[in-house]
Amino acid sequence: MVFVVIDGLDASGKSTQALELSRFIRGQGKTVLLRFHPAEDNPFGAKAKQFLYARGKSAHFAAALFYMVDVIRSILLYSWRSYQYVIFVRYLMGTAYLPRPLDHLAYHFFAAVVPTSRHMFFLDVAPEVAEKRLLENRERLEMFENIRELGRTRLKALSLAVADDWTIVNADGSVAMVQQTIRKFLSGSSESK
């Protein structure tokens, strides 16, 4: 089984790239499990999503807590199933939304506990590009979807991605260019860390 993680800021193109990649892999006759987080098919993901539209520190922590439980639930329920590829959209980088130093503590705690892979992609998008995409495509914005939070979270997530040897992909470009980069790196080794 090849475990792939596609993570990044809001509006970095995570879902689009994961869908493109899963279509490509299925087109090669391989089986794929694709999970998005927060997932709305369970109470933890639904609560995480609900708190993302709330304001305040308690909503911030509640969103992070329910998000992490949602991801862990997916690992427990889906990672052991018989698929040739398992793709998770949003995984460890949700911890970057926590205040310092909790972001680093939570990231390293979860990275030590959950499965990791050589195929962990951080889609890096400039905050200005992300904000433009959000304003064009969303009717309602989540608590972190503003230029200030996008910039702050990007710096924290990039530092975590660099420190833990993620593949950082410039996601400011076209869908095709980003997909080509992901496929190029994915065609290398498929062993787990």
Residue ranges of model-derived segments:
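Glycine-rich phosphate-binding loop of ATP-dependent small-molecule kinases
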Residues: 1-63, 116-119, 167-168, 174-193
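Anionic group-transfer/hydrolysis microenvironments
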Residues: 7-9, 91-92, 96-97, 126, ...
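Conserved RecA-like P-loop NTPase ATPase core
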Residues: 10, 89, 157
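NTP-dependent small-molecule kinase module
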Residues: 22, 128-193
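ATP-dependent small-molecule kinase phosphotransfer cores
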Residues: 33-108
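Conserved phosphate-donor/acceptor-positioning beta-strand/loop module used by diverse small-molecule
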Residues: 89-90, 113-134
